[in-house]
Swiss-Prot record:
Single GO MF descriptor: structural molecule activity
Name of the protein in its database record: Major capsid protein L1
Subcellular location(s) per record: Virion; Host nucleus
One GO term describing the cellular component: host cell nucleus
Region (Disordered): 508-534
Any GO BP annotation: endocytosis involved in viral entry into host cell
Species whose genome carries this gene: Human papillomavirus 56
Task of the protein: Forms an icosahedral capsid with a T=7 symmetry and a 50 nm diameter. The capsid is composed of 72 pentamers linked to each other by disulfide bonds and associated with L2 proteins. Binds to heparan sulfate proteoglycans on cell surface of basal layer keratinocytes to provide initial virion attachment. This binding mediates a conformational change in the virus capsid that facilitates efficient infection. The virion enters the host cell via endocytosis. During virus trafficking, L1 protein dissociates from the viral DNA and the genomic DNA is released to the host nucleus.
InterPro entries given in the database record: Capsid_L1_Papillomavir, Capsid_L1_sf_Papillomavir, dsDNA_vir_gr_I_capsid
């Protein structure tokens, strides 16, 4: 009888087993296999680290500021138009534009190229190794015209009941219960400064899933979208930031100035989270309103009140009257003590990584001021009147606005190192192109064809296409262009904002004319006679 032999085998890398062979003379021999535990890879998800991205650094880390400052200011900027809608005559182009206090005023301020600028000191930078840029260190938005509250409204406003005062609720709805209602919108003062347009947000009709059954009259899905704020866009007047032309087909839910418009609200969250911080260096904001009147809407309630929320009534009270409530806003009192304009602001540290550097030699100033929203009424007689007759008098509306922009810019320089140029190209490729810095294309690894007689008609046309002119990426948007290329001056003490800036620095300008102090001459030419002694 032989001893049993044990063999342990390993089948890498997954299975382990144990085999026992018995050899007992003439007795039948059979192997015994004992299956052991089998290792399997984990079925849990493996999370890999995110792909590393380039770190965004502040402009102060690669922009060197100089001690040269310039003042630049605009002329008096005026706008006149109709406060509710644009006026066209004879089906031609617009004769009178829409100018409302509830519109955004977006100024696109164009600055001269400092690299082509006549500098007081030509040794301030090396053009072979450096480039110059502007940094905004101070500004003042001046506003003219008196304080006043302007009204907006709709002669056919959708209101059913005055739900604020006591009234017996009933469901007796006539076909047309629209009324002539006017409101004073939400009071807003706003100023956003950056080198790219400010971003706005509003709600509009969203896309419907293919699996969703939609019938005519259903409430559409909503979608929040972001668009740049343009000059002339309407602000939120108290009825929400939404596309009223798409979402309100009755044309009777809001005042005339926004009934076919889109009201935008600045997307502060998106601009604050901007990686480079170009759209909003800083902002000033003041808003206030209260609900003045309370109405409900006429029309069929699309989503009825659940039956468990009320007890059924009688005498025309079943079903219940309209539960779609709306409040008309009011901007409340306007005072000069809460004004954000007509005062200087100094930029020491921006909220983002861009600390006031004007990339592209431009900056955008987005302004809203409803504290000067007075609408002037103008009346003209159609004929000579001997007594008052309203039928012979035409009434007109006009709104006027007055602005003035003043800035203090600091001259800065950037060293054109390989790291800085790579970073700027990744941030905005147009910057290096504007500085006449080209990047070498990669070396071709494939064989290219080069004809000898490039003007021969025997071969395909080899004429190079003329380079296309550089297109303005913001040409499709509307802005109020303010050209300051000829308005720069180093004589800061000659301008109001410049004197305020010098006072902040603690410096005084030297007198232009030096006056020498001399001893005053005697008023009398004669001298008193000496007394003789006796």
């Amino acid at each position: 009888m032989m001893l049993p032999m044990m063999y342990i085998y390993r089948d890498p890398p997954l299975h382990y087993g144990l085999c026992i062979f018995l050899d007992v003379g003439a007795v039948n021999v059979f192997p015994i296999f004992l299956q052991m535990a089998t290792w399997r890879p984990s079925e849990n998800k493996v999370y890999l680290p995110p792909t590393p991205v380039s770190k965004v650094v502040a402009t102060d880390s690669y922009v060197k500021r100089t001690s040269i400052f310039y003042h630049a200011g605009s002329s008096r900027l005026l706008a006149v138009g109709h406060p509710y809608y644009s006026v066209t005559k004879d089906n031609t182009k617009t004769n009178i534009p829409k100018v409302s206090a509830y519109q955004y005023r977006v100024f696109r301020v164009r600055l001269p190229d400092p690299n082509k600028f006549g500098l007081p000191d030509t040794n301030i930078y090396n053009p072979d190794q450096e480039r110059l840029v502007w940094a905004c260190v101070g500004l003042e938005v001046g506003r003219g015209q008196p304080l006043g509250a302007g009204l907006s409204g709709h002669p056919l406003f959708n209101r059913l009941d005055d739900t604020e005062s006591s009234n017996l609720a009933n469901n007796n709805v006539i076909e047309d219960s629209r009324d002539n209602i006017s409101v004073d919108g939400k009071q807003t003062q706003l100023c956003i400064v950056g080198c790219t347009p400010a971003m706005g947000e509003h709600w509009t009709k969203g896309a419907v899933c293919k699996s969703t059954q939609v019938t005519t009259g259903d409430c559409p899905p909503l979608a929040l979208i972001n668009t740049p704020i343009e000059d002339g866009d309407m602000i939120d007047t108290g009825f929400g930031a939404m596309d009223f032309k798409v979402l309100q087909e009755s044309k009777a839910e809001v005042p005339l100035d926004i009934v076919q418009s889109t009201c935008k609200y600045p997307d502060y969250l998106k601009m604050s989270a901007d990686a480079y911080g170009d759209s909003m260096w800083f902002y000033l904001r003041r808003e206030q309103l209260f609900a003045r009147h309370y109405f409900n809407r006429a029309g069929k309630v699309g989503e009825t009140i659940p039956a468990e929320l009320y007890l059924k009534g009688s005498n025309g009270r079943e079903p219940p009257p309209s539960s779609v409530y709306v409040a008309t806003p009011s901007g409340s009192m306007i005072t000069s003590e809460a004004q954000l304009f007509n005062k200087p602001y100094w930029l020491q540290r921006a909220q983002g990584h861009n600390n006031g550097i004007c990339w592209g030699n431009q900056l955008f100033v987005t302004v809203v001021d409803t504290t000067r929203s007075t609408n002037m009424t103008i009346s003209t007689a159609t004929e000579q009147l001997s007594k008052y007759d309203a039928r012979k008098i035409n009434q007109y509306l006009r709104h006027v606005e007055e602005y003035e922009l003043q800035f203090v810019f600091q001259l800065c320089k950037i060293t054109l190192s390989a790291e800085v140029m790579a970073y700027l190209h990744n941030m905005n490729a147009n910057l290096l192109e504007d500085w006449n810095i080209g990047l070498s294309p990669p070396v071709a690894t494939s064989l290219e064809d080069k004809y000898r007689y490039v003007r021969s008609t025997a071969i395909t046309c080899q004429r190079e296409q003329p380079p296309t002119e550089k297109q303005d990426p913001l040409a499709k948007y509307k802005f109020w262009d303010v050209n300051l290329q000829d308005s720069f001056s180093t004589d800061l003490d000659q301008f109001p904002l410049g004197r305020k800036f010098l006072m902040q620095l603690g410096t005084r300008s030297k007198p232009a004319v030096a006056t020498s102090k001399k001893r005053s001459a005697p008023t009398s030419t004669s001298t008193p006679a000496k007394r003789k002694r006796r």
